[in-house]
């Protein structure tokens, strides 16, 4: 009997954690600003009408570096179709680390800096749960966050990250499905009048 109580308690705890870490999706993206240095910023609202992917990274994180490589490829392939990638380093020493990171990876999109608190607030990540990097946010052409992932999500597993990001980008760039046509009277069939 004690065993079943422990299992029940662990199940409830797991469900509470899962619901606590779930951000509200879909939701309108706040007009988040990424600091580019020298008083310059890039704002998400500048890209209304485009599909935007925001990557939150740590410059020294190998998974983040891999994500930046994949996103660089996506920007080059899909930029002309309306994709815009942005990235933000969130570690304490990001200002010192970012120039070397940019020289090494040469991403074809803006990369700046935000505090961890700004990033956690933007992603609606519970402060009581450890955040695993990177964080990716997918925003549609109307400014709605449709999906977001963090390092612990299977979406960002090393073996499938490029395939998963590509599929999500293609899904978001696809034209909306046409609404089904309403069924009406068939053409060429006359109704009999009585």
PLM-predicted stretches and their roles:
Residues 20-44:
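N-terminal "domain-start" segment that seeds a small globular fold
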Residues 53-54, 85, 136:
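Hydrophobic beta-strand anchors of alpha/beta hydrolase catalytic cores
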């Amino acid at each position: 009997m004690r065993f079943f109580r422990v299992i029940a308690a662990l199940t409830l705890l797991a469900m509470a954690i899962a619901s606590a870490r779930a951000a509200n999706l879909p939701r309108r993206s706040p007009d988040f600003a990424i600091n580019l240095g020298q008083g310059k910023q890039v704002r998400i609202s500048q890209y209304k009408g485009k599909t935007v992917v925001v990557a939150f990274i740590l410059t020294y994180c190998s998974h983040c570096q891999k994500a930046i490589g994949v996103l660089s490829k996506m920007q080059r392939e899909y930029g002309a179709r309306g994709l815009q990638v942005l990235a933000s380093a969130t570690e304490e020493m990001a200002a010192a680390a970012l120039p070397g990171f940019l020289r090494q990876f040469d991403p074809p999109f803006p990369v700046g800096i935000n505090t961890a608190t700004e990033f956690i607030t933007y992603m609606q990540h519970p402060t009581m749960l450890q955040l695993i990097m990177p964080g990716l946010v997918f925003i549609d052409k109307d400014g709605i966050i449709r999906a977001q992932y963090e390092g612990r999500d299977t979406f960002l597993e090393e073996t499938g990250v490029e395939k998963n990001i590509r599929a999500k980008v293609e899904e978001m760039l696809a034209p909306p499905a046409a609404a089904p046509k309403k069924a009406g009277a068939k053409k060429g069939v006359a109704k009999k009048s009585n």
